[in-house]
């Protein structure tokens, strides 16, 4: 085994300095990005999110539901821990159960939100989890319109896409900055 005890060359020293400088700059950018993340105002507020959703499994069983989710805001999003739903029209899909809670809505920017790991679990099978990105409108405090596509991964839903589409409005209104 041979060890090279020669001191580093000027080129090696320069490359080491360059690498350290780049690493420091990347670290600063990461800190700056975290500091400028979207925030919700006001935080610590109980809210409801209400709207009409159309759901189906692989284009079948289309059911229209009126849903209300109940949650609490924090600086970075909303955590929903309860919901109710009523069938407005259509097929046999249940409107009042199946959504796996808690459900987290993350504020991405002043015009976009993400539902984190959305999952629907029913007696016929499970769809999800999947992150669902939706447009956000500060003027109306509304997520959507948009469509969640969740992969079926169990029971009769295995290998099929489950869909939920519509808009949901937060009340009292919040702002994402």
Cite the ranges covered by each PLM segment.
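Mobile, glycine-rich extracellular loop/lid and propeptide segments
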Residues: 18-19
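N-terminal segment immediately downstream of the Sec signal-peptide cleavage site
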Residues: 35-86, 100, 160-177
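Short, hydrophobic/aromatic-rich segments at coil-to-beta transitions
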Residues: 44-50, 110-116, 145-147
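A charged, solvent-exposed segment within the mature domains of Sec-exported extracytoplasmic proteins
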Residues: 127-177
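Short, Lys/Arg-enriched N-terminal segments with co-localized hydrophobic residues
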Residues: 1-15
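Sec/Tat signal peptide C-region and signal peptidase I cleavage site
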Residues: 13-14, 31-39
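Predominantly extracellular/secreted and cell-surface proteins with exposed
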Residues: 64-141
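Bacterial N-terminal signal peptides
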Residues: 23-32
């Amino acid at each position: 085994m041979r060890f090279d005890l020669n001191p580093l060359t000027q080129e090696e020293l320069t490359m080491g300095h360059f690498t350290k400088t780049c690493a420091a700059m990347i670290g600063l950018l990461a800190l700056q990005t975290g500091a400028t993340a979207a925030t919700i105002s006001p935080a610590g507020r109980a809210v409801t999110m209400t709207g009409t959703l159309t759901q189906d499994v692989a284009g079948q069983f289309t059911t229209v539901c009126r849903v209300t989710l109940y949650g609490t805001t924090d600086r970075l999003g909303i955590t929903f821990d309860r919901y109710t739903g009523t069938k407005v029209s259509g097929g046999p899909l249940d409107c009042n159960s199946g959504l796996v809670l808690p459900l987290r809505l993350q504020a991405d920017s002043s015009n976009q939100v993400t539902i984190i790991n959305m999952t629907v679990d029913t007696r016929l099978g499970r769809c999800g989890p999947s992150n669902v990105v939706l447009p956000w409108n500060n003027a109306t405090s509304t997520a959507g319109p948009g469509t969640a596509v969740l992969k079926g991964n169990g029971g009769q839903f295995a290998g099929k896409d489950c869909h939920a589409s519509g808009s949901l409005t937060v009340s009292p209104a919040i702002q994402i900055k």
